[in-house]
Amino acid sequence: MAQVINTNSLSLLTQNNLNKSQSSLSSAIERLSSGLRINSAKDDAAGQAIANRFTSNIKGLTQASRNANDGISIAQTTEGALNEINNNLQRVRELSVQATNGTNSDSDLKSIQDEIQQRLEEIDRVSNQTQFNGVKVLSQDNQMKIQVGANDGETITIDLQKIDVKSLGLDGFNVNGPKEATVGDLKSSFKNVTGYDTYAVGANKYRVDVNSGAVVTDTTAPTVPDKVYVNAANGQLTTADAQNNTAVDLFKSTKSAAGTDDAKAIATSIKGGKVGDTFDYKGVSFTIDTKAGDDGNGTVSTTINGEKVTLTISDIGASATDVNSAKIQSSKDVYTSVVSGQFTFADKTKNESAKLSDLEANNAVKGESKITVNGAEYTANAAGDKVTLAGKTMFIDKTASGVSTLINEDAAAAKKSTANPLASIDSALSKVDAVRSSLGAIQNRFDSAITNLGNTVTNLNSARSRIEDADYATEVSNMSKAQILQQAGTSVLAQANQVPQNVLSLLR
């Protein structure tokens, strides 16, 4: 080996090795201080890329787990509100069962309906005001997507349904609505009515003109004979009240001589008098209302038992001989109204005036009834249990003050009692139960998703750790090795730097 001064090859070699050990020592110290095997891409380019993807997944899945927990919170909030709605529906059902009992009075039904209305309003309030983080969960149909994964499309959908009184089919729910009007309702509700009722007793049929109370036997008088009229201008049509078996007497129940009353006296009074004149007949004062002519035809009236009674004498549609057999009959009294003016009573032992109540009290069968009010014609069916106007059923409604009023089918539609109220509530409860079940199932699904996300995050962290984290046993060993090499290299470098000194000995 040549002895040179300018170039110290041993020193250069030693310096190079010392630099290597210095780099190794620096890397080991960096890893030990950071805990990471990969502190920059130069440490492991491929490993750094893989670990970074793992980091993205881990962060995304961690947030997804939090999202799933939010989904559980939304479902719990919604389910809690539905539980309150369910409680209100249960109370409404309880009240409806109470309302269907026939022992309730009108005031009872009103009180029940008032509480039902409050409960229904509370359902709407809960629906409109329940929200989660500003999102109303029951006020409208909504599909809420919850991101439960680190990538696009990894979602779970919560179906939020609108739950309020209308969507539950309880809009207008009523247990105290208007009831179908009957003839009796018309009798107690109307003023200034016109029309007629027909009744049958045995083989005989009778027609009572509502506007006048005239009684005509249809079977024996094909044409209209002279009639006895009972005024019904006050609207109280009690002359045809089959349920209560009450009616206004045509005349006071007074005896008549030999079973025959002479109505010619009335005809004569009409013939000889003028409108407004009064005269007495059987102790009753009559007033001439109308006078058709000098033949005795006309109308007179009086007040009996508080009711205005009108007697009309005429020969409409028949001569005196044609209608002598026209009869008005009940099981108790029989009399005949004829143009000749004879009122003949078949029951000679009683000789009482016929009363419309007799028709009612002896099982008269109601036929079809037609009543006109302010130009509108109402029709009652044969049983008298339904009243219609122009083909639509009429209803009786009670105002807040308890006054009964007649309303038509259209007006009653919004107020009428709910058909099958218990079935309606059961349907609403079923819908609420279905939504609650769905929310319960979605909560369980979120729980499962959270568990799976946790497992995935754990495994990804482990995988990333194996790539990215520093192995302290290895790194400490590397550091110790590098430190020893540094010490040895430094010592050897000192020796290598002394080699050129040997050349000086040659110069002595």
Swiss-Prot record:
GO cellular component, one term: extracellular region
InterPro entries reported for this sequence: Flagellin, Flagellin_C, Flagellin_C_sub2, Flagellin_N
Main location: secreted
Alphabetized UniProt keyword annotations: Bacterial flagellum, Secreted
Annotated localization: Secreted; Bacterial flagellum
Molecular-function annotations in GO: structural molecule activity
Pfam family, one: Flagellin_N
Gene3D superfamilies: 6.10.280.190, f41 fragment of flagellin, C-terminal domain (2.30.220.10), f41 fragment of flagellin, middle domain (2.170.280.10), f41 fragment of flagellin, N-terminal domain (1.20.1330.10), Flagellar export chaperone, C-terminal domain (6.10.10.10)
Source species, domain of life: Bacteria
Further remark: Individual Salmonella serotypes usually alternate between the production of 2 antigenic forms of flagella, termed phase 1 and phase 2, each specified by separate structural genes.
Matches recorded under PANTHER family: FLAGELLIN
Known role: Flagellin is the subunit protein which polymerizes to form the filaments of bacterial flagella.
Recorded family membership: Belongs to the bacterial flagellin family.
Protein name: Flagellin
Lineage per the UniProt record: Bacteria, Pseudomonadati, Pseudomonadota, Gammaproteobacteria, Enterobacterales
Gene behind the chain: fliC
